[in-house]
Structure formats: C-alpha cells, structure tokens
Amino acid sequence: MKAKVLLLIVAMLLTACSYRGGLARVPAGQEAATIRPIFFATTRQTDRLPFGTLRSRSSIYGLVDVSIPPIHKAGQIEWPNAKPDPQKHFLLASTETYQDGAGMRAGLNKVLAKKDPKDRAVIIFVHGFNNRFSDGLYRIAQMSHDLGLPGVAVTYSWPSAGNPLNYAYDRDSALFARDGLRRLINEVTKSNAREVILVAHSLGSMVTMETLRELRVSGNTRALNRIGGVVLMSPDIDLDVFKTQADAIGKLPDPFIIFSSKKDRALRLIEQLTAQKNRLGRLEDVKEIAEYNITYVDVTAYSEGGINHFPTAKSPALLKLLGQVPDLEQALSGDGGRTGLLPGTVLTVQNATALILSPVASR
C-alpha cells in the first residue's frame, strides 16, 4: 500500500509540474521562426504516429528542423495548442527519415561540413523517465538554443511510456534501449564530428552507463575513444550499480560530469520506493565517488520549487550562467572550477571534484 501511495505522489508531482502538448507542424503559408536541426534515433514502434510507447528491436533514424518562437523564455518549452503558431510555439518546420544509420551519418556529415571545424561537436541527448518522443526532441532543442551550443544535437528516444505511473515499464525499457543507443553511438562516432558528447537525464543515465559498459566489455574501444565527455543530469541510478558500471568501463570519458540537487523531490521519492537512500543524483557527500575522476556539480542553490528534477535545463538563472561561460567544457571540469570560471565552492576528494554552484557569487 505504501508503494502505491508513493507512486501516486510521484505521478501528481510529475504531471503537475508543467503542461505538455504534442508535436505540430508549422501551418502552411506561415514562416518558421528560429530553426534548430535535431537528428534523432528511436527504438519506439510507430504504433501511434509520430512514435509511441511500444518497443522496437530496430532503430529508426531521422532529422527534424525545430522552429523556436521569438517569445521563447529560457528553461521553458512553449508547447503548441489547437492553433499552432510559429510566433508562440515550438513546432516542426520539416522532417526527414533515413533508410538506416549510415543514411543518418551521411546527413550528419553534411550539416557538420557547413560548420567551422571547432564547432563540429555532436551532442547525443538521452531523455529520462516519463518522456514521450516530443519531450526529448523539444528539450534538446530548447537546451541547445538557451545555451547557444554551436555543435549538432542528436536525440535518442527510447521507449518510455510517457506516464508517471509506469515507472516499472520505463525501468525495463531503459535496459531494452541499450542496443539502440549502442548503434547510434557507433554511427555518430564514425562521422566527421570533432568530438562526441553524451548528455543524459534521469533514467536516461542508466541507459547511457549500461551502453558505455557494453562498449567496453565488447571491446569496442574505437567508439569509446571517440567520446569526448559525459554529462549525467539528476541521474536515477543506484550508487552501487553505478560503481559496478564505472569499474567495468575503466577509464571514464573526460570530462565526466554529474549534475545533482539535494532538493530533487523525484529522486527522493524513488529512494523511498526502493527503501535505499543512494541515488547518484542525490548524494550527500562526494566521498561516495571519490575513487573516480568525476566532477560532481551541486545545483541545489538553483532549485526553484516543484520537483527540482531538471534544474540544469529549466532554471533560467542557471542557463544564463552556463550560457555566459566561454568554454563550458573546461569550466565544468575540476580544473575549470579551480580557476574560477564558474562561481561557487570547489572541493577535491581523491580523484573526484565537487563544484557547489552559488547564484549569490555570480551577481
């Protein structure tokens, strides 16, 4: 009974945090606004267009041009309603699907070729629990836009149920989704990208770590060596599980960054559900991961109410801070924190670095 009550509380928190619409196209005869091209790979079946909740053992690849409205506010997704308007809503300006992963790689190379060599980084975003295809697509478009990321974004949409009551289904889907992410990483690391960065949120962190582990165990060092960094945001991973994954991977991609918040109510409820207070995204002390070369970024000070499960993407103040840093990758590494590129307190414990960001110091 207690578990059912906690699940209901999780559902209420996650559904009350924001309105979520769906995908809609720019109406015929209207001009798109600011365009962000987003490549995608998904292991969702096309049971309900665009992509539903059922699992597919094969991947579908494509490209979507996302139109971002001029009224956009940092940290938000302006969802379309019954009357989609490119001046007010996130919309699809154009869509394209590829026959296979090689086709997507060719399309990716075309986009990369138009960029300055220093801007040819590719970011692979892996969404979290309770996400639909549209959530992951629009979220990486929003983050890329708000942070002014110069590279190319790819979203991996694994078959989450998009329902806060289906946590068990999503946990199983996270394991199911490993092969699809592995295939995507293989294709992207064969592209002309200068470097490949993995960014994952919540339960997507489990998908990411399991996939990195599989790459190492299978001996795919080519793909692993092309990964220039990993960012886990509010990771929903048991600490002991994470340690076994990290041990199997061996030398972690550098930088390896974890964003956390002690006010993350979603992870706190999951800890109560599992009766274990050891989620990676809510550690009390960086000593827990001191043996690993990791930068643990505490963004508790940027919590703004609600469930606080995604402040890195939703806090306007934090987005503004990160967006103003000239070299964000260096700033979020341990050395960057010590050189004062970001405001806050830096603690070093063995191999790990804790960076506690301070909005007061940033004024």
Language model feature labels by segment:
Residues 13-16:
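C-terminal motif of bacterial Sec signal peptides marking the signal peptidase cleavage site
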Residues 131-136:
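Short substrate-entry loop that stabilizes the transition state in hydrolases
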Residues 124-128, 201:
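The conserved beta1-alpha1 loop
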Residues 18, 22-98, 106-112, 116, ...:
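Lipolytic serine-hydrolase domain surface
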Residues 127-128, 210, 234:
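Short catalytic micro-motifs in class I SAM-dependent methyltransferases
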